[in-house]
Amino acid sequence: MDRDEIKSAIEAILFAWSDPLSIKDLSEVLDIGTKEIEGVLAEMINEFNYSKRGIQIIKMNDYYQLSTRPEHYEYLQKLFAPKQNRGITQAALETLAIIAYKQPITKTEIEEIRGVKCDKAISTLLEKELIEEQGRLEKTGRPIIYGTTINFLKVFSISSLDNLPNVSDFNISVDSDILKDIYEK
């Protein structure tokens, strides 16, 4: 890979992962030495800053993450401001069902089941206090694990997760692999 391809790959990895990644993790994924990764990241940080892009690469100890630039906070705040009386989308409902049946579960595992990104759905569910962060996995990147809340039980009038209906009881026509993924524990 040439240097531009390495930069492109690092940007894609940091974007897709969303949590901080170490140089060691990037080195293993790209099969490139840590010193070269470190040099490329330093160049990328300078390039992102010089071109005043909307995103930046931030360094936290030996970890790196993509982040929006602080000067765009007011725009993002408007975008993500809680909206009153907003319903729940089909995507959020699907995400909630997966979390309810598979918890504790990571965002990546949810996305593998759904086949699409779920950032907005998770954000909505957190905002409505139907799910919560229940910690982090002790593996590379330390991904957040999600589970349902007491509010989830209250909203859906169930006393415990043991009272969730069996997925096989639903008369739904979905890809049987998806149904199997959700139901298998």
UniProtKB/Swiss-Prot annotation:
Protein name: Segregation and condensation protein B
Source superkingdom: Bacteria
Physiological role: Participates in chromosomal partition during cell division. May act via the formation of a condensin-like complex containing Smc and ScpA that pull DNA away from mid-cell into both cell halves.
Keyword terms of this UniProt record: Cell cycle, Cell division, Chromosome partition, Cytoplasm
Cellular component GO terms held in the UniProt record: cytoplasm
Compartments in which it is found: Cytoplasm
Pfam family, any one: SMC_ScpB
Cited Gene3D superfamilies: Winged helix-like DNA-binding domain superfamily/Winged helix DNA-binding domain
Family under the similarity heading: Belongs to the ScpB family.
Source taxonomy: Bacteria, Bacillati, Bacillota, Clostridia, Peptostreptococcales
GO biological process assignments: cell division; chromosome separation; DNA replication
Subunit structure: Homodimer. Homodimerization may be required to stabilize the binding of ScpA to the Smc head domains. Component of a cohesin-like complex composed of ScpA, ScpB and the Smc homodimer, in which ScpA and ScpB bind to the head domain of Smc. The presence of the three proteins is required for the association of the complex with DNA.
Regions that span the bilayer: none
Statement: the UniProt record of this protein carries the keyword Cell division: yes
Keyword Cell cycle: yes
